[in-house]
Regions:
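N-terminal "arm"/small-domain region of PLP-dependent enzymes with the aminotransferase-like
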Residues: 1-31, 118, 328
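Conserved PLP-binding active-site segment of the aspartate aminotransferase-like
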Residues: 5, 196, 265-271, 285-328
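PLP-dependent aminotransferase class I/II
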Residues: 12-14, 35-37, 173-250, 254-257
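Short loop-beta-helix segment that forms the pyridoxal 5′-phosphate
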Residues: 44-66, 78
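Short acidic capping loops at alpha-helix termini that bridge into adjacent secondary structure
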Residues: 50-54, 154, 172-173
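PLP-dependent aminotransferase-like
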Residues: 69-124
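Active-site phosphate-binding strand-loop segment of PLP-dependent enzymes
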Residues: 102-158
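Conserved PLP-binding catalytic core of the aspartate aminotransferase-like
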Residues: 252-284
Length: 328
């Protein structure tokens, strides 16, 4: 089976990094977490901000949920986007509005000033999940037009895009969510963080659990920071592999929507064609998402989305796709 449903990094960590985890990440496993400040200090130094500007979260999902609960009286989303942006207000019985930003010309943020002016919270992804890319000026422009908070999920920032993590001093209603899931391949350890003005971060800190992240995850994150060169090279390899596979699909006649993440997206002309393709892949034990799948909102079932896997996985999928006949 080739499971490409989830957008995590498919490569296993190299032995030398795993050995570091075994020696160091688990050393405090018997103790309640006491190492938050050490990681926060390192992140503050990395981003050239103060420690009071950062709070650790149990992955980006907890960060989204916390921000929604603290600031989300009236939330605005731009679809298609990450499903948790929709799930958090639904789960917490919060008011929300979703604007569709995809048409025949592609993805672009579309709004009237009245759409954003009085919202208490606006969620953005940059790069967007599943596709689309905002420039810094667009994000700051939205932040300057609203009285509320603009929370920017930068989970995929290592794949592409221009971060706004150093803009919150001049744009005080910005909150930036980061994750170790994609840029550092630690999706299974559920560790992320939020950066922003100290006053906003303190409001979030007051609502989170005291021990919301395990000491194992914190120690692993610090090891990952030490191995930044390895992870940067890995992301570049994945980007190159994904772009190559997109090129292959175009040559085979598929309609491709280029992404700025590790996702590959095919847009079919009709539902029947998408159904046939997914049925064919399923018969070959290749698992993909049709429509929203498990992590997206705003896609209909003419979209087929899957992660860029390992080099071997993608070569195997390429061989399988070459055998596809639309009359299957």
């Amino acid at each position: 089976m080739i499971d490409l449903k989830y957008g995590d990094i498919k490569e296993s960590l190299p032995k030398r990094i795993l050995d570091k985890f075994c020696r160091n990440a688990f050393r405090d496993a018997t103790l309640y977490p006491k190492n938050y400040d050490t990681l926060i200090s390192r992140l503050a130094k990395k981003h050239n901000v103060r420690q009071e500007n950062i709070v650790l979260t149990n992955g980006v999902d907890e960060g989204i949920d916390l921000i929604a609960r603290v600031f989300g009286k009236d939330i605005l989303l731009f679809a298609p986007t990450y499903y948790e942006f929709l799930d958090a207000p639904r789960r917490n019985n919060l008011k929300y509005e979703m604007i569709d930003c995809f048409d025949e010309n592609g993805y672009s943020i579309k709004y009237r000033e009245d759409d954003v002016k009085n919202k208490s919270l606006i969620f953005l992804c940059n790069p967007n999940n599943p596709f689309g890319l905002l420039n810094k000026e667009e994000i700051i422009g939205i932040a300057n037009k609203t009285k509320g908070i603009v929370a920017v999920d930068e989970t995929y920032i290592d794949f592409n895009g221009e971060s706004v993590i150093n803009e919150f001093e001049s744009v005080p209603n910005l909150l930036i969510l980061r994750s170790f899931s994609k840029g550092y391949s630690l999706a299974g350890l559920r560790i992320g963080y939020i950066a922003g003005k100290a006053g906003l971060i303190e409001k979030i800190r007051q609502r989170k659990l005291v021990c919301n992240v395990s000491s194992v995850s914190v120690n692993a994150a610090m090891i990952a920071l030490d191995e930044g060169k390895y992870f940067r090279n890995l992301i570049n390899k994945i980007k190159k592999r994904k772009d190559g596979f997109e090129g292959f699909l175009r040559q085979e006649g598929f309609g491709i929507i280029h992404t700025h993440t590790n996702d590959i997206i095919i847009k079919f002309k009709n539902l029947a064609d998408a159904d046939k393709f997914c049925s064919f892949l399923g018969s070959k034990k290749v698992i993909v998402n049709q429509g929203n799948g498990i992590s997206t909102c705003g896609l209909d079932k003419t979209f087929v989305r899957f992660a860029c896997g390992t080099e071997k996985q993608m070569k195997d999928v390429e061989r399988i796709v070459k055998k596809y006949n639309p009359g299957y």
